[in-house]
Amino acid sequence: MENQKMPISSVPILKDLSRPIANFPPSIWGDRFINYTCQDENERAQKERQVEELKEQVRRELAATVDKPLQQQNIIDATQRLGIAYHFENEIEESLEHIYLHTYVENTCFEGSDDLYSVALWFRLLRQNGYRVSCDVFNKFRDNEGNFKNNLMEDAKGLLELYEATHLSVHGEEMLDDALEFTKTRLESVVSHLNYPLAEQVRHALYQPLHKGLPRLEAVYFFRIYEAHASHNKALLKLAKLDFNLLQSFHKKELSDIARWWKSLDFATKVPFARDRLVEGYFWVLGVYFEPQYSLARKIIIKVFTMISTIDDIYDAYGTVDELKLFTEAIRRWDVGSLDQLPEYMKPCYKSILEVYNEIEEEMDNQGSLFRMHYAKEVMKKLVEGYMDEAKWCHEKYVPTFEEYMSVALVTSGYTFLTTMSYLGMGEIASKEAFDWLFSHPPVIEASESVGRLMDDMRSHKFERERGHVASGIECYMKQYSVTEEEAYDEFCKRLVKAWKDINEECLRPYHVPKPLLMRILNLTRVIDVIYKNEDGYTHVKKAMKDNIASLLIDPMIV
């Protein structure tokens, strides 16, 4: 049955249809990123030599702090915040293991163990690197009634570090929930009285907590903060700036290659109703992994990302139900012969999907990882079937219960799809067992999907309601529970808190899959927090998104 083809005569001839066209804004970038001038080879080689020399210097300095936990923690923190921790993964792992064993397992006091900043930094570094340390370490900063002591009120630096640490909380840690409320309220009240750079750090953290930010983007912000501290490590800062510029050139070359491929497809002409968001998509992918060793992985996922963005718009911004049934069936068949069954406007997209997957399949075959293609195809089929369900709801003007909506909307968030595709180019670490784990829909995946869906609905439901889109989660929740929009928002915010705690829990040891695979899920979730913080920054590209893209792909660091 699966390989039978619908006769051509059954393809409906549809004229003068009322289509749900969204009138998405065009790309703001034009051909800006197509042309890339390669850096002078001698100049690049010289910078690479400098980077290697500075890396050795930083390694020596890190090794010299082995018996100075606080100093060691500060170097590790700076290295991670400046975006160069990928050069020192083994050294950082060994250092944190040493700190964990000597200060937590053996309960040995360390310099600064009675200082809020030092303890909060210790807690955050260990938690964000997977160590299951207890929040009871903060008991010493609370009075007999369980409130945080009054003498902390003036310790803005310590409060800021505690605030950052609270974002790594898991379920059952009411102390950290209280600490978040306490530190947030206090920092908001004192920020206008602080001096630079602490004032800037507090403002930024209140807007974008470190744990939910994109590492590469947070590094851009942290450069100027770190440099403003008189005690900053000059070798570390220079290394970070040189490395940033080298990587930026590398990313611009990648984007240039992808942009030429994208232009050759001519989707702007062939599928003009869809969002043209290649550059924004590449920014999204950089949020998932920016490190040079993931170049192949980025090239795979960005091509698939552009395809799925276009398919999404075919389903909810142009296609009729009858046309979409044909496309859904064509994806199920996964056969070039299905092209003849599709309306003309669908053919370029379907043909391109098959071509992209064939490219990926060839690469996987070369790596001896052909088994991955089964997962890549299955997750695409499931996503498209979810789009079809939503299209039927929209056509029928059906408002599902919130639970029914979420059962489909978690799939159409695209985050299981993107996670699956993000694993394809990651080498041997992405084993069959890892894909089976992913397809078992573990809590961390459901939590990531929830963040994606809830934040998307909160930021885009008004625009989508105006253009006749399927009812969003906000509308479904309001109708089912007879609540106001504000009350629905409050419930969504509570669910977001729960989802982040689920993610934090899954990122603690022992890991179910290797940590690099978990990091893709965490980073995909972070992308949503950044792009959808105040608006749908992917669909409607405004100043915040433009500035973020410019900081990663246009503006170099001054060394």
From Swiss-Prot:
It comes from Santalum album (White sandalwood). Mg(2+) 2 binds at D312, D316. GO terms for biological process: diterpenoid biosynthetic process. Sesquiterpene synthase. Mg(2+) 1 binds at D312, D316. Keywords: Lyase, Magnesium, Manganese, Metal-binding. It comes from the Eukaryota. Its EC number is 4.2.3.-. This is Probable sesquiterpene synthase. The keyword Cell membrane does not apply.
